[in-house]
């Protein structure tokens, strides 16, 4: 099998067994009701007779709607035999999604959210039509019918729906009531609500109905719409905040049935070095000398009109459409940013192959004929997505669908107003927070469209070639001028980067005449490697224990330590100047806390990047025979440099907030809750500056003492004597916080005590962490004992620090005195307020979701 469906010969066996059982059961009656024949008396009607008076919609599959609009009838064409001789009425790609959303990012039921395309086939089983999803994870490419049948019968398929045949024509075409298929909870809304802790919901059939005006049949696709109502009890806070009646949630669902693409599409094998997505499956027809697992690159069909020319127009260009619901000036920013990809296609040898336009009036954003950039509103800022809806057989992209959260641009404006103030807001100047936010939206549009073109994240791209890809998460590149001003003139790059050009060339480009495609594709990646263009993606970057120092989200600079030094300098200036001018006129002064919080944590992502240097590993993805270096541990000197600046982040000077800022923030006005954007508080309604310090200390300490990082420190130091050991890292942390400055004021003494507590708690947690190896836990326990043995002070410590020391000394003694079977009693660390969109918590080392983030 190459592009056709696997044969399900087991269906023939099922029919045979069914017939035999029926014969035994009803032989005494000699019934004429053979289960392989029509059992419904109405089935003797022709389709024309059954649908008389209904509105007909002719297309890929014909639809019939009665005047009441309460039902949907589907005509299926006469059956044809597939490659295995099985009769199939129709095959299609099926995609379901939501036309309207709940509006809550943590729950995730967004407007325009689509499921993954699946292959389905309609077949006849007695007096029923069955809609079945074949199993494409296991195939037998190019094999004969017997080999394909062996694979098909070895793995399960999934029957999605079935219905009794209502009418039939002499040629074998049949009519079925398709209403129940459209009115089912295909998107799993009830399951999602329950899984998100939002109560026990179920689909209410009495309050769910077809949207007949949204049901259309086109030559190559059928689009169906329904309004579904879910009822439940004990609704969670996200449902209460977004649904007018929290016990009743009504959403519009969408279904698409799409004609299968023709077999002219030429697939391209995926390469783990190329930075793209892939369709993966097991090919049981592979030769014994070949790997059984196969990967196909996910990409649009793009064919040169003049393949012999080095540069050619395409037979059909790739066109994206921007949602008319996006307002100006955002709409123009989306058109411009998404349009940057035209440059990459031109460089790959295609003229006018990519363009971006406004969605035609009346066009449905979920219609699979349109690649769409959709503007989505939520009650809080949230994720943006780029979905490449592809043929699961070949990887050919059928529809690109981008969902952009509308509150992102407002959050970016708030971030820049925190750093730069509000004086320039709305002026159109270079440092206008609105203009900077629009620059970010251009980047975001390009980034998400990149996903729908088949490209994955490249989280190392911000470290080379002047920010080499829009597929990284771009932190604004800010700096401090010699006269102490924050310079935002180079905040975001414009246009395609060096890696973007490579990735599109590899994915869509054509080998020159006379050169084999595989050879040419390898040369494209070899040239990129020679230019030190790295590709590191989510698996390299997102985990808190990740190892590569250059695989980071929201970072800048080729060296993480240099990047942290720069971020700390920008943060210092922003905090020193923070005041009433950082919030717009007429806003409640308490809202200064929303502006201050991201300024205080401005360096959080560079902290996360610098943590990866300690116990870090510098590597590249490679294939056998490509000549790339495997890499090795980060040099010891660089690891110790990183450790030193991370310890500096625990100093009172870094943790404190100027008193000029502390007194600015009053309690919140009546009726305004703190929300999820802010840190927790231990001081009731009053601003809690010390909680921010506790959070910052926890990020540094817990990141350094992650079990995977500690395991690497153990292994690296035993192999290379010049690299820091886990014992050295624990001892350095302990000495820094257990021997404070004797001249510290009470103000700083409390902050020193907070840092001490973070270190002791972090080592205790590591010693008790079941994920850590015995060797790591043993060193953590030894480090705790060593910490208690350190000299308590030089000179006379502040009373505040002494109180913390005495408290933690008792805690450590109690820790060691616990019975062996007792549960751990390590207190939890405070968590950072969201940097990525609401819905996930992170220590700044990663984010959750497809595309998210602070900036």
In which residue ranges do the predicted regions lie?
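Bacterial N-terminal signal peptides that target proteins for export
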Residues: 1-9
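Bacterial N-terminal signal peptides
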Residues: 9-19
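Bacterial signal peptide processing site
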Residues: 21-23
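Auxiliary tRNA-acceptor-end handling modules of aminoacyl-tRNA synthetases
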Residues: 25-326, 344, 358-411, 416-433, ...
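Zn2+-dependent metallopeptidase catalytic core
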Residues: 79, 88, 327-353
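Sec-exported extracytoplasmic/periplasmic mature domains
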Residues: 339-350, 450-451, 455, 476, ...
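The catalytic-center signature of Zn2+-dependent metalloproteases
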Residues: 358-377, 439-495
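Conserved catalytic/binding loops enriched for acidic/polar residues
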Residues: 462, 466-855
